[in-house]
């Protein structure tokens, strides 16, 4: 799945730095220093302690021991930082993917009108199969019908009249984004007709209108989730055209951003999640990843719709869902799976909004968790509807970064060396208040500075390796 959860393996934490190694370095340093002192002692014997000859030698010995311990601590810090960086990037990547997949708008109100008025009731088996020999192909059977733009304007007026009262109740004024997708080709005439209908009684909003072609993918829906917090009104319909034999349908969905509702209002409302790219050739893997994204609770029963799938995936949907142990509504459709092309008709790309409208209407019969699988000529998508907010970042916990012991020791040695040079070349400055202030300022800067610099360098060198691992983790 193009938005599947990354599977980058985390690395095991490195073992903590060992005090025994530090003790060994100290003993080895003292022993080495003692050997050097004996080898370099004058022929007359070792100098006395009161002579002062031991002071610089002792200083150099402890400086060497400190340098070796600093190198060991820095090496351990680099290893620990690499592991910490890697694991944090893994968790951050998973969280980012989940946050992206969990984007949704709340369906505040909807209208779904099908030419076959008994479609949903038959799917839930509350009405017997009594379809007439001649299928009903048009909406509003009591009104006159003129194919073309006149029919579009007629159905649009009816659809807007149905949805506008609920919009006014929730959102009486303000900016509103409107998406119109129809089966017609003359978008300019549709635009003129839409503005006539809309301006007749819906002038309270500042509208931004998007007319979409009939063959536009449902994946384009994602841009409207990501771009703004404006409410969105989707109007999708297939209206009668000359020489057209497909049954008409019309659907309207008024959706708002979760921030527009208080907690009690948005608790059990229906949510429409972003469309997820789907590879129907590996349907089992794709549906497994869709389940793992936890858009809907795994324990809840699901209803699955599909349209446009090739023969092999279409015939294997039920089997794959059973193998994945996805609980289904056995009493709806065919064991919880609805082939929209068979029970209704195939609308190609327009089937996306047709199924979403039908699924929103179906929620009134009980199914709140629904998956919609749609394949077109060039791509395929999976859309999820649910009435529960997804759990985001359930594996997100704070792991403190490794202690910068090596950086601190390096900073101490660096400042000690610089101060020694200052004493050698500028003794008056070194023992003055300005020299002490300069030393303190250097300590303040180098203590955090070296730690930050080491982490930045480590991350910069390690990032290409992580990117390669992410690309080979099954991501497209």
Regions found by a protein language model. Give the residues of each.
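Conserved "HGTGT" condensation-loop signature of ketosynthase/thiolase-family condensing enzymes
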Residues: 1-229, 236-242, 251-364, 371-476
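Short, solvent-exposed loop/turn segments at conserved positions within beta-propeller repeat blades
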Residues: 245-247
